[in-house]
């Protein structure tokens, strides 16, 4: 099972997105778990992640996450502002799964 880890400043805004993503994944029968963590906790939850998606408001932290994930073969990406703002769950899931491979 693949795990998508979303990260934002406090975990609040992404929690709504996670709910939409979970609903979309279930409707499509995808074997994926999706969870949100605030920035100050996310680094402690990388080991079982298949991909880390950062909210656009913390895109500045991408380099730090790439460094932390480098030896673990975990891709890191920033969710595009338009997709994040529109809560485009399916588009975000599809992008994440494409990067995971």
Task: Report the location of each language-model feature.
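Conserved active-site segments centered on acidic
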Residues: 2-39
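Ser/Thr/Gly-rich flexible loops in soluble cytosolic domains mediating phosphotransfer, phosphorylation
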Residues: 3, 75-101
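Short glycine-rich anion-binding loops that position phosphate/pyrophosphate groups of nucleotides
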Residues: 10, 57-59
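Short, well-ordered alpha-helices that flank and scaffold nucleotide-derived cofactor binding pockets
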Residues: 19, 23, 67, 94, ...
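Short helix-capping segments at alpha-helix termini
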Residues: 25-30, 70-74, 101
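Short acidic active-site motifs
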Residues: 38-42, 61
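Short acidic/histidine-rich motifs immediately flanking catalytic phosphotransfer sites
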Residues: 46-51
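A short, gly/pro- and small-residue-rich
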Residues: 61-83
């Amino acid at each position: 099972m693949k795990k998508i880890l979303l990260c934002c400043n406090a975990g609040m805004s992404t929690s709504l997105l996670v709910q939409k993503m979970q609903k979309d994944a279930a409707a499509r029968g995808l074997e994926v778990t999706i969870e949100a963590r605030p920035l100050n906790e996310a680094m402690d939850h990388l080991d079982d992640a298949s991909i880390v998606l950062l909210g656009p408001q913390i895109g500045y932290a991408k380099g730090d996450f790439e460094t932390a994930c480098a030896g673990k073969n975990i891709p890191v990406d920033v969710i595009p502002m338009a997709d994040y703002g529109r809560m485009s769950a399916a588009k975000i899931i599809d992008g994440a799964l494409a990067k995971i491979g």
